[in-house]
Amino acid sequence: YAVSPWTRNGGVFTEHAAHESQIMFLEEWSKAVGKGFHTKEINPWRRAQFSNLVNMLDFSYHDGSVLKLDEVPEASKDPITDQYNGADVCALKFRSDVQPTVPYNNTEAQSLRVEKGYKPVRGNLTEGHYLTFEKDGKALQHKGHKLSLTNACNDHDGKDMRFVLWWQGKNPKDNAFYISTADKHDRKYIASSLELTTKEKAAQFSIADLGNGKGHVITEIDSGKQLSVEKDGCVALTKNASDAFKVFSVTF
């Protein structure tokens, strides 16, 4: 979790990170305030491959309002020693049920249950999400035989708007993906022509976060062209496109 005025309502951040990422974030912060330092203990490969977490922050939006937190009871203390005794109180309260029971007879549907909803995405992307890509009230859709646009919906979860990424890199920061439809029973992949095709004919795309709320740019790697929304409402690959898409991670 990241708590700051620049991460409020920030949603999902999926860049590859490790403990070193926190140190690299402090390095970036120290440079920004004019007191930079460099930690030599982080080896070059990890420094190159893991996130410095800066993309978590949106410096174009600031919310400094004070959160209203729920009231919680004061932690229990022993009346004689004045030491915290929460573990003993818990053991006494639940007696033989201190350890959770083994969840026998649970089904896969129960164990993998998640809440329905959506969150905006920050940072460069990874696998493991259903994603929608939107711009100016329109959303990319895979209805028919070619990538096209439709009106976005409030919950960002239209069946024809959901896409899945398939990572094609070797190192964590390799930004190369197949983009497919979400239906595992009739999965189609986006080709360089933006038509929907088989995996064997799929194109590889990079998806880069421009930072500070500007959105993500989608680039077809072989041609170097970027996914763009044309004036006539069609989707095309063009050079130096200015279009960036807002990305939402969706569960349904």
Give the label of every model feature segment.
Residues 89-92, 102, 242-252:
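Extracellular low-complexity, O-glycosylation-prone Ser/Thr/Pro/Gly-rich "stalks"
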Residues 8-11, 31-39, 226:
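Substrate-binding/catalytic groove segments of enzymes
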Residues 1-29:
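Substrate-binding rim/cap in mid-to-C-terminal beta-strand-loop elements of soluble/periplasmic
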Residues 33-70:
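Polar, surface-exposed loop/tail segments
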Residues 103-145, 164-194, 207-233, 249-252:
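Extracellular glycan-recognition/adhesion modules and their associated mucin-like linkers
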Residues 143-160, 191-205, 230-243:
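Short, tandemly repeated low-complexity microdomains enriched for cysteine and small residues
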Residues 67-130, 135-137, 146-162:
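Long, His/Glu/Asp-enriched segments that create or flank divalent metal/ion-associated functional microenvironments
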